[in-house]
Amino acid sequence: MVVLALSGCSSHWGCADTTAERGEAGVRVRVEEVTGRPLDVFAEVVDWRLEPHPQVPAEGDQVHFRFRFDGADDMTDPAVDACAVDEERVALGCRTIHSYQAFGPNGSPIGDEWLAVADPERVTGVLFVPNDQSYVGPTCEEDAKDGGGPRPPEPARAGDRL
């Protein structure tokens, strides 16, 4: 009788990584989990403007934008990429924004952030990418036993067409 024993750590059988498709960027988006299922959370760019950052005014204009998350709570805390874009929707600068950042002074549900871009005069808007970036688990390569599964797309970055 031959007994074949395989350690979960040495076997890639049954472990698979999948990457979600990037969702349609917009001023107001419904956040999507990694499987593509929409959450009951909406992220919205309230407004934006070009102005010097008060802590580094010598660096010139940056993109200052205000945003809100409707439907988020302490248990969901999704995160989406925010990107300043040009007229062709090419990202000029991006950063990940978490829903917990959307709480301003005096209980306001509106947060604000800054995006530094190389050519601020090209900015025509700020868009959110709807894919939830709040959790990225280990890959099969990193942990063959417990890793794998659906993953969000790579974070948006300058040069991406949204």
Region roles according to the model:
Residues M1-V2:
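Sec-dependent N-terminal signal peptides
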Residues S10-Q62, E142-R161:
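Transition segment at domain starts
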Residues E51-C94:
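Mature extracytoplasmic domains of secretory-pathway proteins
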Residues A5-G8:
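C-terminal motif of bacterial Sec signal peptides marking the signal peptidase cleavage site
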Residues V46-H53, F65-F67, T96-S99, I110-W114:
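Short structured motifs
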